[in-house]
A protein has these predicted regions:
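Gly/Pro/Ser/Thr-rich low-complexity, intrinsically disordered segments predominantly at protein N-termini
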Residues: 1-190
Length: 190
């Protein structure tokens, strides 16, 4: 692992990391992303987070496999959503439509915005950081972002066209035109 970069007043700021350099970073038992060239390190997801993400992955995965709509990506798959400085985000679940899948599979973190991104909130998530992730996904071209809040038992839906909505636990998550035909009662994954 490269030496940690430190900033001392009066000196030049530390060099920014690239998506390619991030491939070589190994921090056991941590989740990492690259945000505008700066390494972001987080604790592993907790029990509730993993359960909710797993429940939705099973339902969404069954639909994607049955319809052959595209490819589902598991938690912590990195996608390069900006260059210069680089930003590599790793959602809890991502879906890319079949016609947009790169061929052959790219090495590393592809310059590709998933069509659907799912973020499951953890107790330590800060609202500003979550909204920054949503903004990064949408500006990169993601069409639909679901932010699921297990504690409040709601999901916030953000769309590329700028519209937003809230799904209560007694309502249904809908794949809209991004994952056609997919719907899932929110309560069934919480």
């Amino acid at each position: 692992m490269p030496a940690e970069r430190a900033y001392v007043p009066g000196m030049s700021p530390p060099a920014l990391m690239t998506a390619e350099e991030l491939l070589h970073v190994r921090i056991p038992d941590k989740r990492v992303e690259l945000v505008r060239g700066v390494l972001s390190v987080r604790e592993p997801a907790g029990y509730t987070h993993g359960r909710v993400a797993g429940n939705l992955t099973l339902r969404l995965g069954a639909h994607v496999e049955r319809t052959r709509a595209g490819q589902l990506f598991a938690a912590e798959t990195g996608f390069t959503v900006a260059r210069g400085p680089d930003t590599v985000r790793a959602p809890d679940i991502a879906f890319v439509r079949r016609e947009r899948l790169p061929d052959p599979d790219p090495r590393g973190f592809p310059d590709l915005a998933p069509d659907l991104v799912v973020e499951v909130l953890s107790p330590d998530d800060r609202p500003g950081a979550v909204l920054a992730k949503v903004a990064d996904w949408l500006s990169a071209g993601t069409k639909l972002v679901w932010v699921i809040d297990p504690m409040r038992r709601v999901a916030r839906v953000y769309r590329h066209d700028g519209t937003e909505s809230v799904v209560a636990q007694d309502q249904t998550l809908d794949g809209e035109d991004v994952v056609p035909g997919f719907s899932c009662p929110l309560a069934s994954i919480l």
